[in-house]
Amino acid sequence: SLLBFKBMIEST
């Protein structure tokens, strides 16, 4: 899912 993808990338 895109949301999961974004969350994974922006995992600060």
From Swiss-Prot:
Superkingdom: Eukaryota
Cofactor annotation: Ca(2+)
A GO-annotated cellular component: extracellular region
Tissue-specificity statement: Expressed by the venom gland.
The keyword Lipid metabolism is assigned to this record: yes
Major localisation: secreted
Annotated localization: Secreted
Cofactor detail note: Binds 1 Ca(2+) ion.
One GO MF term attached to the UniProt entry: phospholipase A2 activity
One GO BP annotation of this record: lipid catabolic process
EC assignment: 3.1.1.4
Reactions listed under catalytic activity: a 1,2-diacyl-sn-glycero-3-phosphocholine + H2O = a 1-acyl-sn-glycero-3-phosphocholine + a fatty acid + H(+)
Enzyme class: hydrolase
Keywords assigned: Calcium, Hydrolase, Lipid degradation, Lipid metabolism, Secreted
Family: Belongs to the phospholipase A2 family. Group I subfamily.
Cited function: PLA2 catalyzes the calcium-dependent hydrolysis of the 2-acyl groups in 3-sn-phosphoglycerides.
Protein name in the entry: Phospholipase A2 1
Annotated source species: Micrurus tener microgalbineus (Spotted coral snake)
